[in-house]
């Protein structure tokens, strides 16, 4: 394993913040009362809390100490842009009492950036999967929603849109350095084959495709569905993995997670593709790359999860 392979924001511990500290921080963004409730939420690299008062609910987000301000400004500006370009149900950035979206606070002895976004009603797809009756309609809805989100982000740019991100498809080849972290020999060989396929086939074809800022993380934890109709997507959260990348990779990420769940690349992709294409026409060259990119994302997930396990890091949201 290459000891030079490093992504500090994933390796540094999440901020040390308890419920009381979170409530103290939240009062700068919302009116609290004696009945206010703090609920810790799972997260990959930062610390998030659901803050509930009699008036509203909101999400307090405390960044990892190693997170760069410019990356968080990029995410905030993207949310503000989407407020103007789409009617989709998405988190909205909230200003604090001083009119700021992002502030620096000492949290657990470290300086961290703190912000707040609105809470979205809906049920995470991962929590309701067992009662899904019509996966076809679900996938059509997911594809359609993602396409609308892509259209909303089209034309948006930011100085930090190319920030280093381990989940960037463009970083695929860097994962050769940590293949040794996969203990199971068969899994390691399969992962290596996937990386070689990307290197020798997918990479060049992908370089010719359309690029724009994408969400890059349509996984079942981030997809919100209706309680009344769990096949209908009503919102999407977590814009922490956004970056400038090939547009088709946004759909490939969604297909990868659905493929894992249905154990079939075809059934995990076909209706997502149809739903997406019905709203935002894909080029033939993009559609042809979809299976390769979904396969690549599955391999990335395996390799990254094994790397994080080898460093005793949290595996949440892999």
Please annotate each region the language model reported.
Residues 316-318:
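Conserved small/polar residues in nucleotide/adenosyl-binding loops
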Residues 42-55, 59-60, 93, 199-249:
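Active-site acidic catalytic loop and adjacent metal/ATP-binding pocket
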Residues 129-186, 211:
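A cross-family kinase active-site recognition segment
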Residues 247-281, 296-313:
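Active-site activation/catalytic loop segments of kinase-like enzymes and analogous catalytic loops
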Residues 54-157:
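ATP-binding pocket architecture of kinase catalytic cores
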Residues 1-32:
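Juxta-kinase regulatory segment immediately upstream of eukaryotic protein kinase catalytic domains
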Residues 116-131, 177-181, 300-314:
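A glycine-centered beta->alpha junction motif in the catalytic cores
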Residues 18-28, 154-158, 174-216, 226-228, ...:
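An alpha-helical support segment within catalytic cores of ATP-dependent transferases
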């Amino acid at each position: 394993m290459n000891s030079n392979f490093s992504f500090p924001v994933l390796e540094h511990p999440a901020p040390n913040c308890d419920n009381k500290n979170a409530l103290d921080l939240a009062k700068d963004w919302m009116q609290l009362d004696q009945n206010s409730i703090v609920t810790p939420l799972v997260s990959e690299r930062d610390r998030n809390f659901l803050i509930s008062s009699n008036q509203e609910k909101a999400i307090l987000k405390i960044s990892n100490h190693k997170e760069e301000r410019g990356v968080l400004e990029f995410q905030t500006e993207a949310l503000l842009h989407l407020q103007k370009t789409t009617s989709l149900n998405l988190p909205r950035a909230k200003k604090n009492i001083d009119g700021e979206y992002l502030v620096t606070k000492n949290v657990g002895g470290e300086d961290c950036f703190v912000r707040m976004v609105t809470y979205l009603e809906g049920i995470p797809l991962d929590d309701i999967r067992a009662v899904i009756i019509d996966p076809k309609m679900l996938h059509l809805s997911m594809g359609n929603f993602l396409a609308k989100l892509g259209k909303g982000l089209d034309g948006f740019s930011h100085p930090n849109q190319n920030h280093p991100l381990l989940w960037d498809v463009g970083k695929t080849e860097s994962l050769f350095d940590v293949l040794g972290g996969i203990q199971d020999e068969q899994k390691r060989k399969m992962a290596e084959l996937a990386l070689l396929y990307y290197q020798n086939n997918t990479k060049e074809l992908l370089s010719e495709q359309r690029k724009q800022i994408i969400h890059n993380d349509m996984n079942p934890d981030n997809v919100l569905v209706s309680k009344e109709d769990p096949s209908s997507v009503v919102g999407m959260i977590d814009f922490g993995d956004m970056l400038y990348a090939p547009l088709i990779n946004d759909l490939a990420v969604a297909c990868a997670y659905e493929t894992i769940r249905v154990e079939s690349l075809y059934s995990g992709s076909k209706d997502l593709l149809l739903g997406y294409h019905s709203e935002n026409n894909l080029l033939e060259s993009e559609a042809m790359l979809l299976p390769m990119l979904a396969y690549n994302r599955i391999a990335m997930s395996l390799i990254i999860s094994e790397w994080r396990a080898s460093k005793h890091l949290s595996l949440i949201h892999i």
